[in-house]
């Protein structure tokens, strides 16, 4: 039989067959870019547009919240050498044995939701760091000072502003790609 032109289901199926689908990895990458851009916007609402103030806000959130991540990692037996690796290994919570997870939550006095949110925020903040700051702060044995080491790393405000713009643009582009 001929294709009925007014059959909406057939028209829809014919149309979606022309649109390339994303792979699961692409969906995850785009979702992370959207989430990172949204978190940057949230930090920007707190800090304003000054790139150094924005970095200080992100740094303060990260350094203040890091002890919870380190305590949780120790409680579930995750090695603490590199903050980037540690953040990848503690998430998702479902990857940890239920008894170890329950014990860690009791030790920390946290709910699953609060801990998941804390871990998610630390991952986002670490991802927001400029590459030089991320590399500087990656070793777990390096104490996190109350202020980011701006002078030590020679972090230029214009370069920081460009870094924030790139993250924002990538987040917006990812959002468009996911909704097209």
Please annotate each region the language model reported.
Residues 1-180:
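Transcription initiation cofactors for RNA polymerase, centered on bacterial
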């Amino acid at each position: 039989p001929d294709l009925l032109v007014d059959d909406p289901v057939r028209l829809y199926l014919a149309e979606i067959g022309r649109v390339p689908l994303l792979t699961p990895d692409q969906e995850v990458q785009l979702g992370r870019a959207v989430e990172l851009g949204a978190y940057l916007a949230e930090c920007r609402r707190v800090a304003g547009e000054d790139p150094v103030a924005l970095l200080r806000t992100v740094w303060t959130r990260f350094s203040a919240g890091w002890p919870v991540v380190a305590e949780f990692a120790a409680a579930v037996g995750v090695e603490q050498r590199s903050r980037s690796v540690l953040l990848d290994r503690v998430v998702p919570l479902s990857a940890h044995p239920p008894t170890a997870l329950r014990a860690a939550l009791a030790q920390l006095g946290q709910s699953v939701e609060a801990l998941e949110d804390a871990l998610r925020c630390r991952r986002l903040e670490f991802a927001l760091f400029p590459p030089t700051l991320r590399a500087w702060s990656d070793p777990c044995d390096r104490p996190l000072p109350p202020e980011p080491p701006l002078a030590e790393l020679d972090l230029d405000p214009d370069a920081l502003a460009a870094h924030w713009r790139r993250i924002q643009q990538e987040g917006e582009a990812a959002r468009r790609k996911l909704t097209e």
